[in-house]
Amino acid sequence: MVFLSLKYALSGLAATAAAVPHANRNTCDNSSLNTTATTYTTTSEDTIFTVARKFDRGPCDIARYNRMIDAEHIFANFTLRIPPQVCNPDSTTCFLTRQNATATCLKGGPHDYRTIAGDTIEKIALYKLNMTVESVYENAKMGVSSIHEELPVNTFLKIPQCVPSVCHVTPFHFTYGVYKDIAEMFDTTVGQIMAFNGGYNYSESASDADAAWITVPTGCTNLALNVTEEI
């Protein structure tokens, strides 16, 4: 099953991740761990890092346990489930990383990207869509003076599409992880998954059976050697 493969792969990855600075458990006694799962309602002052420190957990363990779109996408009044402690808390592997993007159009689409809090042109291009900053900025300046300036929330950006190109889409039962994990598994981008699932942020459900089904684009490819960029 896809989910099992993803979860086991992440477990192996977490085993080699660096521990959170305040909780070095290099010589770990499983019997000393707090294995109680609880919930926590975030405040406007919280980040994934403050929550992790508060409960002595790995930020990535919390993000994946709550099936978040992005570990850093956290705001007031999120009801987060706090996972049991583990010997190797993960503080690194779930975060979006800057890509050395060369693409100037998006294979297969979609055409629109809806902004969320914290989005900038640079973050959308290099961290979420794996496209050059210039290709996104040219068509989505929206009055911002810098690629680092935060964009208004819930604004649709027109993203250049490669023509001709195609994506296939598949339903995916999102029972564990973050969008970065799914993007790596299906060889797609976080931004494309976000664009297909605009109403989803994270899951409060403790049950895998009640976890969300999301739409994942996969197999995105150009259909010709020479493509045009269309808005």
Curated annotation (Swiss-Prot):
Inactivation phenotype: Show no significant difference in the expansion rate of lesion diameters in apples fruits.
Source organism, top-level taxon: Eukaryota
Keywords: Chitin-binding, Glycoprotein, Secreted, Signal, Virulence
Gene name as annotated: LysM13
Misc: In plants, chitin acts as a microbe-associated molecular pattern (MAMP) that is recognized by lysin motif (LysM)-containing plant cell surface-localized pattern recognition receptors (PRRs) that activate a plethora of downstream immune responses.
UniProt xrefs under PROSITE patterns: LYSM
Pfam families according to UniProt: LysM
InterPro entries referenced in this protein's UniProt entry, alphabetically: LysM_dom, LysM_dom_sf
Family of the protein in this entry: Belongs to the secreted LysM effector family.
Cleaved signal peptide residues: 1-19
GO molecular function annotations of the record: chitin binding
GO CC terms in record: extracellular region
Glycosylation sites: N30, N34, N77, N100, N130, N201, N226
Organism expressing this protein natively: Penicillium expansum
Residue ranges of every copy of the LysM domain listed in the record: 38-82
Protein name per its UniProtKB record: Secreted LysM effector LysM13
Location of the protein in the cell: Secreted
Function: Secreted LysM effector that might have a role in sequestration of chitin oligosaccharides (breakdown products of fungal cell walls that are released during invasion and act as triggers of host immunity) to dampen host defense.
Domain remark in the UniProt entry: The LysM (lysin motif) domains are small globular domains involved in binding chitin in eukaryotes. LysM13 contains one LysM domain.
